[in-house]
Structure formats: structure tokens, C-alpha cells
């Protein structure tokens, strides 16, 4: 089936003009995972014109290009619960999210079947088997620094941390203390060492009451950004690529707020190559910021709302130049050379499906429009 997507590349005309048809990314997965490292300094653009093209993005078989795919918010509540107990419940995502060399989502739930709800409107939880479902779908790591990771209080948090220790894929952004919460996980593919980190700056009761500190468990809080910046700088010293998956932005807004912009700017200066995230439940814009590629909001992904605009989503696939990523990089410049947005709609079953025809054209327009309020450039 044809996949409609926008591809942003360096060197041609404006990407805001036309949509494009593209075949799905494909190829064997080549990633391996190593254990997280603890955090404790190395900063490292200039825009040109760009184009929307119809040529396929480099897939997992291209040795000179590392592809990283990102999806938005995932939970397993309500009618999504059976998916968490079916190890193949999300396997249809392998042709999109799972087709890249490495992929990542935001796991917006406590991993527990116990505990007491904390005082808020919505509460999400899932059994540890949900991690097997995600792994089978081709997900290589999940971010859990968000406002639902501790929805079931201290008991739920203990279960979540136990699930993290036994997880088939790395979980970042939550831990038994601040060191663990801010620790990066290392993913390796095509000889490229990729650090992934996660933090939240959403001001609500999870961040206020359940931010990890020196002696207490919880999520990694980037309010203030001091500890996150230190973690990025440490990861920069020991990795070829540094990815930060943030929980940021304002509910139901399609443009980034000032705090999100300032945080992304600070992370780029600290050495992050890729900054992505969500929280707004809306697809936001994306583009290049100096040496980094930034996405201000990936939207919902596996979710219990199947009506627009909540159901608008997609997969962001970034192509990293392997030679440049693994070189010393004495001169500045981004290692992400190409970005592809594949628009999708969440179906009645809560699972996103690739948009086609008029829907694809319309959703590509929504994504391009969202990019116009970001201040980001459309090419490296």
C-alpha cells in the first residue's frame, strides 16, 4: 500500500507546496540495546532551501544512513486493554514505526495493576506485558517522563520500576532516584551509538509531587533544565547521536509555547542532535534548529480517541548521516539530513493507520501549517 508522506531534504524547492506519495519504509531491523549509563560537556546551522519529494527514505538496509522513527503518546486504557495482553497486538505498526533502524514512543501510563489513583481526572495503567507488545511492534525504547507515569501512586511506581528492570526494551525518564531517572539508554545500530533520554516540563501534580530527587523515585523533571542539560552533555561525550524525548507544550495547542522553544534551544546548545516530544495531543510542527532536529509535538499515537483532531497522528522518520555521526565533527552542522512525516489517523480500535487519498493530502497540509509557527528551518 502506498504511504503518503512529506520528505524534507536539503537543496531544492519549498516543502510547503505539494504532498507526495511514498512506499513504506522497509528492511530488517539492525538495532541492539545496551544498559543505561548514569548522567553527570560538548556543544557542537545554517539553513538552505528544501523540497517535498516522492523518492523513498533510506531504510534499514542503507549502510550509510541510520533511520530513527518516533511516534507519540501510547497508553492501553479502556478498549485498548486487550492489546497490552496480546504480544502481537500492535504488529501492524512494524511497517511504519518499526521499519526504521531504531524507534521510540512515549509510554503515557503507569505499568502496574495495583495502587491507588492520585487526584486527577484521567488515570492510565497497563500490565508489564504491554512492553512485550511494544517490542514486537518494533519499538526499541520508550520514554516515561510524563504526567501519567505515576498515576497509581507509590505502589504503582514501585511496580513500574520493577517492570522497567525486567523490560525487553529500555525505559528512560523514570527511576528509583534522580540519577536513574536522568540516565540515558544506549541503542546501537550500524555501528552508531545512540543515547536516548527523557524528561518532562509539564507543570501538574506528577511533576510537582513525583519528580525524582537524590533519595526519592519518580520522573525526570526538566523544570528547571539544569539536570537535563548535564545529562545531555555527558551523553554527548560518549555517544554518536543524542536524542531527547520531552514531555512539553500546552494541551490542545498546535504551536509551541515559549518555554518549549527555550528548552529545545538549550538542549541544542548542550549537544542534542534530536529533540522530539509531545503532551499537547495535537500534531505540532518540526524542523531544524542549529545542529538539531526538533519536533514540538508528535500527537497521540495508540490512544482511546478516534475522532479528529485527537486522532491526527503520524510517524516521524529521521535519516542520520552515519559517516558524519561517527566522525569527530570538528565543524558545526546537523547530522540529521532528511525528515519524513507519514500522516496517520487513529482508528476506532485505537491503533493508527496510514492515511491515504484526500485524508493524506489534508493531513500533510495540517502538518506543514503547524510548522509555520515554530521558527524552525525546513532544511539542514
Please place each PLM-identified region on the residue numbering:
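C-terminal motif of bacterial Sec signal peptides marking the signal peptidase cleavage site
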Residues: 9-11
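N-terminal export and membrane-targeting signals
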Residues: 1-4
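Acidic, metal/ion-coordinating pockets
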Residues: 13-31, 35-39, 44, 49-380
